[in-house]
């Protein structure tokens, strides 16, 4: 039904809004996971390093986080990520070669989610997306919560992204209750 389809924002339309609602000079910041981390480090509460082959920083990271999330720094939507266990490789140089072949350039400490969120799907970090939009300017800008939703992985996959088979459930902005089946 065409009327029903008009109630959804397509990816193309979403990117149009994204470009219009965000300052152009911030796009590079949010397209690069490591730059985002550097800017918002106090809010992360986990370790994240830029991977550039063998380094003392990488060696120290592996001592603290032998199992970690390797990422392509400019990837999105659940692509370009993999949980790696350094102990499963014969050597650190072998791990480095593996990561370089896959263009991984960010290493991130794994997130341990709460027991309540883990009950939804224990293999993934299930997340709540709370997008906000500043809708007015001046001395008292109004910040509006824009369609919050819960992302849940499924079928043992460690990715919760809807584009990778995850389930997306809308959250009512007023009550905070889940209001769709997914």
Report residues per predicted region:
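ATP-binding N-terminal substructure of ATP-dependent carboxylate-amine bond-forming enzymes
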Residues: 1-25
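Active-site nucleotide/adenylate-binding loops and adjacent lid/helix of ATP-dependent enzymes
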Residues: 16-137
